[in-house]
Structure formats: C-alpha cells, structure tokens
C-alpha cells in the first residue's frame, strides 16, 4: 500500500489539520486579549491582534493569495519568538507541571512547536 501524499487523494487536504489546530489555538488565546485588561497593557492588545488575525489569515489563505498564508504564519511566528525570548527561555526546554510552579514555569517546548508549524506556513505558503 502506497501512502505517499502525491498518490493519496486525501493528502491534498492534510494541511487543513495544521491550519485548523494552529488557528484555533491562537484564536482561543488571542481574543481574550482584545477585550479584557489582562495586565499586559498595549503589548497584550498588540499580541492579541497578531494572534487572532494571524489565525484568520491561515484559515482564509487557501482561498486567497499565497501571501495571506505566509503573512498569517509570520504574524504567529513573531509572537512565538517574542514569547520564547521574553517569557519562556529562562525556564528551560521542558514544561514543568507541579503545584508550586503553576502558572509561570513553563519551558519553551510548546512555543517552539508552535513556532515550527507557523514557520512551515511562512516558508511553504499554500504549497504546504
């Protein structure tokens, strides 16, 4: 049985799994920053805009020009680079889930994964 994407008719739709999961993640984390004071000030509002619009661009990208997908991926990549360097880098790679460490001792493994997926869309666009 040959499972190569080129010969698999469902392979043409595989990118939707990444798009929908990544977009849902960023919409769910971004929209609260747009309407509520989360103690982040202007930066939080800016981050929320990038998260929500980056996600929307990823979802509408396949129906529009390739650049929309790339810009959406870039917006999310910028947020993830900021999150890694400003918040998570000093906490190491692994996430730590202990009662004493919650909520702010998470390593950057999750953010690195999200950065990698978003960079895929920056580099490949709609050809993902």
Model-derived features: where do they sit?
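Extended, low-polarity transmembrane helix blocks
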Residues: 1-36, 44-49, 53-56, 60-128
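Short, aromatic/His-centered strand-loop micro-motif at the edge of beta-sheets
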Residues: 39
């Amino acid at each position: 049985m040959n499972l190569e994407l080129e010969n698999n008719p469902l392979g043409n739709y595989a990118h939707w799994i990444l798009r929908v999961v990544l977009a849902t993640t960023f919409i769910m984390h971004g929209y609260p920053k747009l309407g509520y004071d989360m103690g982040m000030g202007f930066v939080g509002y800016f981050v929320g805009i990038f998260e929500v619009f980056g996600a929307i661009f990823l979802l509408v990208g396949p129906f529009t020009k390739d650049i929309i997908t790339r810009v959406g991926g870039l917006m999310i990549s910028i947020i993830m680079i900021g999150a890694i360097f400003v918040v998570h880098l000093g906490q190491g790679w692994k996430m730590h889930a202990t009662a004493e460490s919650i909520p702010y001792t998470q390593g950057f493994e999750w953010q690195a994964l999200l950065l990698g997926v978003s960079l895929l869309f920056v580099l490949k666009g709609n050809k993902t």
